Regions:
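TPR/TPR-like (Sel1-like) alpha-helical repeat modules
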Residues: 202, 206, 212, 216-247, ...
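Alpha-helical segment of the N-proximal tetratricopeptide repeat
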Residues: 38-77, 81-91, 118, 122-125, ...
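Helix-start (N-cap) detector for alpha-helical repeat units in TPR-like alpha-solenoids
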Residues: 35, 42, 76-77, 110-111, ...
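Terminal, low-structured helical/coil segments at or just beyond the last alpha-helical repeat
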Residues: 24-38, 237-294
């Protein structure tokens, strides 16, 4: 798993209680506003942006947050909100600029530091990601999502023992944090410790049996051990939950290593699995073209 829990979303929602509730909405043609009024209107816009973000209306939220940052340029929370929304809309470069501004105004804000770590990770600047995630964890050490992200950054730097250590810390903080359990399995499989990997994926599924990634990883590993019936059943179930796991690029994006990807290619090429993928693709095409007739 690359990223399952959005620290950015948590930071955005956390701002919801930080902005004062206002009954009025922004009046579009207000003349001669003084500094206090401008600040109030900026905070109203920021509050609206948070509310829109809660309903996943990110582009509308972003427009309001951009204006809010102009009206309240010295408010770290507004800049953090703007940076988070840029990340949410896959605009990483402006996200880093906004988050750096937030951090300059509030250096000890762990959520901002975590968000910067996430942003640098997306830019593939893994050393920078490690730096900012560790800074945030010095302030809030028991944050499982940040520990998980730090593990992923170490994974990308091929610092595997450190990655596993961070994943294990995340699970110690939150025993139900299945992505960290899953990723320990990914690493152990690459190390040739197949039985340990299988145990990790079974543990992840005991936490949430509806997660396709540990289900498919377990299927691939079991097939390699000759347990074909269970492997095919689990693999088909995983793909029916999320057919993207039938794409090798998607597996690689989610930190599947070379050894597991190699076995996954063989598994996904099996006639039964290919039949399932074709069926799912046809079903998806039918849903996207409901008015089309033969």
């Amino acid at each position: 798993v690359l990223k399952r829990f959005s620290l950015i979303s948590l930071a955005i929602l956390g701002l919801y209680t930080a902005f004062p509730a206002q009954a009025q909405v922004l009046v579009p043609h207000v003349l001669q506003l003084d500094g206090d009024q401008l600040e109030q209107q900026g905070l109203i816009l920021a509050q609206e942006a948070v509310q829109l973000a809660q309903f996943q209306q990110y582009q509308l939220a972003l427009t309001r947050a951009q204006l809010a940052s102009q009206l309240v340029p010295n408010n770290a929370q507004v800049w953090a909100l703007l940076g988070g929304l840029y990340l949410q809309t896959e605009q990483t470069d402006p996200a880093v600029k906004a988050l750096n501004k937030a951090q300059s105004l509030d250096p000890k804000n762990a959520a901002v530091l975590f968000a910067l770590g996430s942003a640098y990770f997306r830019q593939e600047k893994y050393d920078m990601a490690v730096q900012y995630l560790k800074m945030g964890l010095q302030i809030k050490p028991e944050t499982p999502g940040a520990l998980f992200d730090l593990g992923n950054a170490y994974y990308k730097l091929n610092r595997l023992d450190e990655a596993i250590a961070e994943y294990e810390k995340a699970v110690k903080v939150d025993a139900k944090f299945w992505p960290a359990v899953n990723n320990i399995g990914l690493l152990r499989y690459e190390q040739g410790k197949t039985d340990i990997a299988i145990s990790q994926w079974r543990q992840a599924l005991s936490i949430d049996d509806n997660q396709p990634e540990p289900k498919l990883a377990l299927a691939v590993a079991l097939y390699g051990q000759g347990n074909q019936a269970e492997a095919l059943r689990m693999g088909e179930a995983a793909l029916r939950i999320d057919s993207r796991y039938g794409e090798i690029k998607f597996l690689q994006d989610n930190l599947w290593g070379q050894r597991l990807v190699g076995e996954a290619k063989k598994f996904l090429a099996l006639p039964k699995i290919q039949q399932t993928l074709v069926e799912l693709k046809q079903k998806s095409s039918g849903q996207s073209n409901p008015g089309q007739t033969n």
